[in-house]
């Protein structure tokens, strides 16, 4: 009996010591501005269209699918629970994709036994637009993703990401599991929020570009729109790119090449055809402006930029082979936010200084000569966007960039942030925090990788896209941009000096 009591006491002491060690590990020591001076380079790698649950919903210690309390059961247009998930819709008119079975009303594993679609396989694209995204969130209930999606039940799919290279990197450094995309909707608006924490303006936009809303400030549906999501995706009267009061919210093209709008036949080939209604050049202050005002070096590097410039300046009759062309890099012109701003117009010194090709980014890493702040946008085939890219290729590409930085002289004073512009229409169970008219919206993955990142850590601090701008602003003592959200963190919760 004495030995049993002794063993029990030793066990209790060991348990107490282990809890003390754990407690010490999570004691927060606020990061000081002096400590931040150790970070000389900030690298932001901006992937595409993945919700947190879609890639990291099974990550140990994260707020994942097993913790979901909201939106697990999706509801129909009338608010009643769906008997099953809608079919995965493809084509016009939409029909059920025969490669997917009928799925029960709950999240499902894309690479699991029911569906057998590993993350090396492309899936179809899903709607990810301003008004639809808000309707899917449904006031924080997160239960109308399937009903509003043009891809039906696909929205509820997720992967076991444990074999991803980035997953293994997240295990070594910090994964932020409450990082939210800056704005409702798609890539165009979220890239603008990365650049300026602002929504672009389009005064006097043509009526054909303006969204048609109902009395509840939702997209107006056509009379023939299916009453039930099981009968097909919703049909809208006019799913425009501009709000009725003149803000650009869905994909609009730049007035400058590379653009999805070719040059005018009789115009300057550096510009897009003004008669086809590109977004007027914007004048809001960007994070780039704030950096330049303090003489701090920065650049936006885009995969395929030089090829796209050549492609975009061709005569309008020439076939595009790079911009939105899947047989090459599939350059996405609306993923280039600084190209929408007047300060970076063709012919300006600042354009030449700050808008650069992705190959220069990779070469600069090898040379150990990156600017203080570097944004990197992978080319279309490597950005993980559903519909034209798989997860695996982008995962390997981004992990390779991290490895290259770690091998370079840059590593010892660099902070790398890997995140995604938006959720790509995929469901996530965590409601976004209260914000403003524009966002924030769904959770997206965010990894913080640095010698100064906490190791093996899941950061539950609420962040959004503007948190990156907030960190850059604090580190380099910049004038804050007005749209940066004060209630959200500045990423220093992921750091330890």
What are the roles of these predicted feature ranges?
Residues 9-20:
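Bacterial N-terminal signal peptides
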Residues 22-497:
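N-terminal pro-sequences and low-complexity stem/linker regions of secreted or lumenal proteins
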Residues 1-9:
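Bacterial N-terminal signal peptides that target proteins for export
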């Amino acid at each position: 009996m004495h030995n049993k009591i002794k063993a029990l006491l030793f066990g209790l002491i060991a348990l107490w010591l282990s809890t003390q060690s754990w407690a010490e590990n999570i004691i927060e020591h606020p990061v000081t501005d002096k400590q931040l001076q150790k970070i000389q380079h900030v690298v932001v790698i901006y992937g595409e269209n993945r919700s947190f649950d879609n890639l990291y919903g099974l990550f140990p210690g994260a707020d994942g699918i097993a913790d979901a309390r909201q939106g697990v059961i999706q509801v129909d247009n009338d608010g009643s629970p769906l008997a099953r998930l809608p079919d995965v819709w493809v084509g016009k008119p939409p029909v059920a994709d025969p490669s997917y079975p009928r799925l029960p009303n709950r999240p499902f594993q894309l690479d699991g036994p029911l569906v057998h679609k590993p993350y090396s396989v492309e899936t179809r694209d899903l709607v990810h637009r301003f008004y639809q995204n808000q309707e899917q969130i449904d006031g924080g209930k997160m239960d109308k993703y399937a009903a509003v999606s043009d891809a039906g039940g696909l929205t509820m799919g997720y992967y076991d990401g444990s074999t991803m290279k980035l997953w293994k990197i997240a295990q070594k450094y910090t994964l932020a599991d409450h990082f939210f995309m800056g704005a409702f909707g798609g890539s165009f608006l979220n890239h603008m929020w990365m650049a300026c924490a602002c929504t672009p303006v389009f005064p006097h936009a043509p009526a054909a570009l303006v969204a048609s809303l109902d009395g509840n400030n939702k997209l107006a549906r056509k009379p023939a729109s299916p009453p039930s999501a099981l009968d097909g995706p919703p049909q809208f009267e006019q799913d425009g790119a501009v709000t009725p009061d003149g803000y650009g919210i869905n994909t609009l093209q730049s007035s400058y090449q590379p653009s999805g709008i070719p040059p005018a036949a009789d115009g300057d080939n550096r510009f897009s055809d003004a008669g086809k209604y590109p977004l007027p050049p914007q004048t809001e202050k960007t994070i780039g402006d704030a950096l330049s005002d303090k003489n701090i070096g920065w650049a936006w590097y885009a995969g395929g930029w030089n090829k796209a410039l050549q492609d975009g300046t061709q005569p309008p009759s020439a076939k595009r082979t790079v911009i939105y062309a899947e047989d090459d890099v599939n350059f996405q012109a609306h993923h280039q936010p600084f190209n929408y701003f007047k300060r970076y117009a063709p012919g300006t010194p600042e354009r030449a200084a700050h808008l650069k090709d992705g190959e220069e980014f990779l070469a600069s890493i090898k040379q150990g000569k990156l600017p203080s702040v570097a944004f990197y946008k992978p080319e279309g085939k490597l950005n993980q966007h559903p519909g034209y890219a798989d997860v695996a290729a982008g995962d390997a590409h981004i992990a390779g960039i991290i490895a290259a930085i770690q091998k370079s002289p840059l590593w010892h004073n660099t902070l790398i942030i890997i995140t995604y512009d938006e959720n790509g229409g995929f469901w996530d169970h965590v409601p976004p925090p209260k914000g403003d008219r524009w966002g924030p919206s769904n959770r997206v993955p965010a990894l913080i990788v640095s010698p100064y990142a906490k190791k093996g850590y899941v950061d539950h601090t609420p962040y959004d896209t503007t948190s990156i701008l907030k960190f850059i602003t604090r580190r380099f003592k910049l004038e804050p941009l007005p749209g940066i959200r004060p209630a959200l963190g500045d990423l220093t919760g992921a750091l330890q000096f």
